[in-house]
From Swiss-Prot:
GO terms for biological process: translation. GO terms for molecular function: rRNA binding; structural constituent of ribosome; tRNA binding. Residues 99-122 are annotated as: Disordered. It comes from Cereibacter sphaeroides (strain ATCC 17023 / DSM 158 / JCM 6121 / CCUG 31486 / LMG 2827 / NBRC 12203 / NCIMB 8253 / ATH 2.4.1.) (Rhodobacter sphaeroides). One of its GO terms (cellular component) is cytosol. It comes from the Bacteria. This is Small ribosomal subunit protein uS13. Belongs to the universal ribosomal protein uS13 family. The keyword Ribosomal protein applies. Keywords: Ribonucleoprotein, Ribosomal protein, RNA-binding, rRNA-binding, tRNA-binding. Part of the 30S ribosomal subunit. Forms a loose heterodimer with protein S19. Forms two bridges to the 50S subunit in the 70S ribosome. Gene3D superfamilies: 1.10.8.50, 30s ribosomal protein s13, domain 2 (4.10.910.10). Located at the top of the head of the 30S subunit, it contacts several helices of the 16S rRNA. In the 70S ribosome it contacts the 23S rRNA (bridge B1a) and protein L5 of the 50S subunit (bridge B1b), connecting the 2 subunits; these bridges are implicated in subunit movement. Contacts the tRNAs in the A and P-sites. Coiled coil: none annotated.
Amino acid sequence: MARIAGVNIPTAKRVPIALTYIHGIGDFVAGQICDAVGIDRARRVNELSDAEVLSIREYIDANVTVEGDLRRETSMNIKRLMDLGCYRGLRHRRGLPVRGQRTHTNARTRKGPAKAIAGKKK
């Protein structure tokens, strides 16, 4: 297994698919990386030489925010919104949907499991 950005990527898969195992790299960015480094998208990871893996690793380190740095940046952005006290920050703090979705029904993913209310019947 090749190790890129602290992640063991699968060797049997094609390079763009294997790169998506890294947090912060999706299909589009994986294709961009292959094009920038000059690796054919149809090649598999086990066919790459050490120099090619190194060039992918260097490109990702220089140009893409991934893994821990990306997670830290995202959490700091949410924390900043919460500290500002803006509407989005309040929604994050209360554990409610942030982007205007309805909450009268649904929103169970964000709100958690339904809580029983004593004395309420249908």
